[in-house]
């Protein structure tokens, strides 16, 4: 059974549609700790503002519970950011699973060039792929992003992307994984990544 964390933040429909596309139809949407602990895999989706999302996790006691899970856990977008140490968005302390901070893109642009748009929105490449999460994925594969904040490159980086500067496209530590990009919106590549996660 796949458990999707319910904390009133996240695009549940796009995630469940993506699960269905890879043949997964058994899932629950819950904030119940017992059900989360019993699940085979846990997905932490997220959209919106990091400090608000952390507050919603804390209201449910999930900010301290999620780091204790021992099965594979996948964060998506803001869900991944909440698994880092802290975020500049709302200046908030996060769960501290991944040993890095979340920063805002600085819209400086290259010297002599027009500033780049923020948020970073659209298709971009992932490189330096590590861990079985990316089994069958080619270096330089294109995935879909929508974000203004990013996890800084660190020892837990398992995929790298570049927009204005290099950043962690995905993170992994022990049984925890997180994608700054949206695998559920990344076509066949994203479907393979989700399938890989379900097979961990």
Regions found by a protein language model. Give the residues of each.
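Amide-donor transfer/coupling interface in amidating biosynthetic enzymes
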Residues: 68, 102-200
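Cysteine-nucleophile active-site neighborhood
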Residues: 48-120
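Short acidic low-complexity segments
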Residues: 1, 27-38
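A short, N-terminal amphipathic alpha-helix
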Residues: 22, 33-38, 65-67, 200
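Short, flexible loop segments at the rims of nucleotide/cofactor-binding pockets, characterized by
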Residues: 19-26, 50-56, 121-127
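N-terminal beta1-alpha1 ligand-phosphate binding loop
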Residues: 2-24, 184-185
């Amino acid at each position: 059974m796949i458990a999707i964390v319910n904390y009133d933040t996240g695009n549940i429909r796009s995630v469940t549609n993506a699960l269905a596309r890879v043949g997964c139809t058994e899932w629950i949407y819950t904030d119940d700790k017992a059900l989360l602990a019993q699940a085979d895999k846990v997905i932490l989706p997220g959209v919106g503002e990091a400090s608000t999302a952390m507050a919603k996790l804390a209201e449910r006691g999930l900010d301290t519970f999620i780091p204790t899970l021992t099965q594979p856990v996948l964060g998506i977008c803001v869900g991944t950011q909440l698994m880092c140490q802290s975020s500049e968005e709302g200046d908030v302390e996060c769960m501290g699973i991944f040993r890095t901070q979340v920063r805002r893109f600085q819209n400086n642009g290259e010297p002599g060039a027009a500033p780049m748009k923020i948020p970073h929105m659209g298709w971009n490449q992932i490189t330096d792929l590590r861990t079985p999460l990316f089994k069958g994925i080619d270096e330089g594969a294109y995935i879909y992003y929508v974000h203004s904040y990013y996890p800084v490159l660190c020892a837990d980086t398992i995929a790298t992307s570049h927009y204005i500067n290099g950043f962690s496209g995905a993170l992994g530590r022990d049984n925890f994984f997180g994608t700054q990009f949206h695998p559920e919106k990344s076509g066949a590549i994203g479907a393979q990544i989700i399938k890989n996660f379900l097979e961990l």
